[in-house]
């Protein structure tokens, strides 16, 4: 079984964690933006049937 030879430094660990968190932030921002545009009816990429 593969075992890491040296311990990862704290700074490298923080950098990787920050990158991982930033990806989640941008994904959630895009999802919120898409939901907002769908609810207001300004979306150009989705076709939503309006129940009247």
From Swiss-Prot:
Q: Cite the entry's keywords alphabetically.
A: Chloroplast, Plastid, Ribonucleoprotein, Ribosomal protein
Q: Which family does it belong to?
A: Belongs to the bacterial ribosomal protein bL32 family.
Enumerate the Gene Ontology biological process terms. Answer: translation
Segments crossing the lipid bilayer: none
* Gene that this polypeptide is encoded by: rpl32
* One GO cellular component term noted in the UniProt record for this chain: plastid
GO MF entries: mRNA binding; structural constituent of ribosome
Subcellular location, record wording: Plastid, Chloroplast
Record protein name field: Large ribosomal subunit protein bL32c
Q: Name one Pfam family in it.
A: Ribosomal_L32p
| Chief localization | plastid
Q: What lineage, starting at the top, does this entry show?
A: Eukaryota, Viridiplantae, Streptophyta, Embryophyta, Tracheophyta
Q: Which InterPro entries is this protein grouped with?
A: Ribosomal_bL32, Ribosomal_bL32_plant/cyanobact, Ribosomal_zn-bd
């Amino acid at each position: 079984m593969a075992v890491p030879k040296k311990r990862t430094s704290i700074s490298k660990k923080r950098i990787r964690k920050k990158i991982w968190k930033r990806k989640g932030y941008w994904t959630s921002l895009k999802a919120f933006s898409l939901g907002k545009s769908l609810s207001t009816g300004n979306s150009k990429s989705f076709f939503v049937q309006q129940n009247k």
